[in-house]
Amino acid sequence: MIEVGDLKKGMFIIYDGEIYRVLEASKHFMGRGSGLIRTKLKNVKTGLVREVNFPSGDKVPEAELSFRKAQYLYRDGDHYYFMTLDDYEQYALSEEEIGDAKYYLVENMEVDLVFHEGTPIGIELPTTVELTVVETEPSFKGDTVSGGGKPAVLETGLKITVPYFIEVGDKIKVDTRTGEYVGRA
């Protein structure tokens, strides 16, 4: 059991008999009374996000998970296929189980497969990934003076804002937690 005041983004808990990933957790105190812990939880199986308020001091069970290194192989329809690096077993995860991580997956990339009771329930991405720009506006001389950026589409379909000097075909690093441009690869 973990106290709700200790919940942090990325943790997995069991709530209403389902496994949830904590997307946000913040503490709110009201006058003299005890505080509230406001959380945003994402159901690992269904992908639904719900907001739950816990009274300060409550405890929730932490989900017992295991992580195994795996390699992303390919996508076939609505399923993404991974191979564990220790025993070379293949696992398929649905698009709902992958969630927004699909925008960062490139074939042969290494990820952590998340298991609960021997069943894969999701993946953990590395902090940054290298992706290729496939579509962006051309840059013009003097664009860098104004700062800001321009929209770009990456090889996985992810749309982000990049600096003006980035061109089509450039490899860039993207933060998987925020979806923002980090730098050139």
Curated annotation (Swiss-Prot):
The keyword Plastid does not apply. Keywords: Cytoplasm, Elongation factor, Protein biosynthesis. GO terms for biological process: peptide biosynthetic process. SMART domains: EFP, Elong-fact-P_C. GO terms for molecular function: translation elongation factor activity. Pathway: Protein biosynthesis; polypeptide chain elongation. It comes from the Bacteria. GO terms for cellular component: cytoplasm. It is found in: Cytoplasm. HAMAP family: EF_P. Involved in peptide bond synthesis. Stimulates efficient translation and peptide-bond synthesis on native or reconstituted 70S ribosomes in vitro. Probably functions indirectly by altering the affinity of the ribosome for aminoacyl-tRNA, thus increasing their reactivity as acceptors for peptidyl transferase. Belongs to the elongation factor P family. This is Elongation factor P. It comes from Thermotoga petrophila (strain ATCC BAA-488 / DSM 13995 / JCM 10881 / RKU-1). The lineage of its organism: Bacteria, Thermotogati, Thermotogota, Thermotogae, Thermotogales.
